[in-house]
């Protein structure tokens, strides 16, 4: 079974959970696993250390994202593809897992389209258009490269940096990048591991949703979970059998999610 796993930035901030590494080690012998990691809070931390104040913008839909100018794009790559990816690979290596880290720019793994403009809400609540910076959306995935690594027993670790048509690095959303990888490689499942059990509505964990039900819930949830739900819907609509939103801090987090234990499942049925 081919599974794409997105390890959320909230988990990377505290260091890679040992329970997650142990679970990947156990599952890697019987499943083909592809990891995509986040790490936005760590990017902000290192940008501040370097004296580069970070700017965040909010879309008319209420989704908050980092504004990525040229200097921020360099810091983003350094932290994501350098520090965090290697930290994850070293943890996997220590557990006996063959892994290899790739930025989405390596081998044109993630091909993206640079956004020329961003429509954001200013401090007065007005919609304004600003330069898109080095932000984009994944348009294509080099699935043959990933299939080659999987055939040799590797667990690919992907940093969410895409390559534009002009060979520029692009900051792309990690959740939606994981969705694109799952769709592009024909994965059976994509799991979004975060620091909560799944989607909560009215104080209760949502166990299952169809893509249409999940889309309808978007106005009711916070921006962090919004991105995961949007990515989950995109994956299922793209042919992935199921998308799972689950906690990465519990024992055997991926195994539990695949068993639909205390998580949110988004699927057609």
Predicted region positions:
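C-terminal catalytic "cap/lid" subdomain
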Residues: 1-64, 68-269
């Amino acid at each position: 079974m081919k599974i794409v796993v997105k390890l959320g930035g909230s988990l990377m901030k505290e260091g890679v959970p040992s329970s997650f590494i142990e679970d990947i080690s156990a599952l890697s012998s019987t499943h083909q696993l592809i990891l995509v990691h986040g790490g936005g809070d760590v990017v902000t931390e290192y940008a501040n250390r370097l004296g580069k104040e970070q700017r965040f913008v909010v879309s008319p839909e209420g989704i908050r994202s980092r504004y990525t100018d040229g200097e921020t794009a360099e810091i983003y790559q350094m932290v994501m593809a350098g520090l965090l990816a290697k930290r994850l690979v070293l943890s996997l290596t220590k557990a006996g897992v063959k892994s290899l880290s790739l930025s989405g720019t390596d081998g044109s793994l993630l091909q993206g389209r640079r956004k020329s403009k961003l429509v954001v809400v200013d401090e007065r609540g007005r919609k304004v258009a600003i330069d898109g910076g080095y932000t984009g959306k994944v348009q294509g995935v080099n699935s043959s490269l990933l299939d080659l690594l999987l055939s040799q027993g590797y667990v690919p670790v992907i940093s969410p940096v895409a390559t534009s048509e002009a060979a520029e690095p692009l900051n792309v959303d990690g959740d939606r990048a994981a969705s694109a990888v799952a769709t592009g490689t024909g994965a059976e499942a994509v799991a979004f591991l975060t620091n909560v059990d799944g989607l909560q509505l009215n104080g209760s964990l949502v166990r299952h949703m169809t893509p249409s039900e999940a889309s309808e819930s978007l106005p009711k949830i916070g921006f962090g979970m919004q991105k995961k739900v949007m990515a989950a819907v995109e994956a299922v609509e793209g042919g992935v059998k199921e998308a799972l939103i689950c906690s990465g801090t519990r024992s055997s987090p991926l195994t539990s999610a695949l068993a639909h234990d205390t998580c949110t499942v988004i699927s057609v049925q």
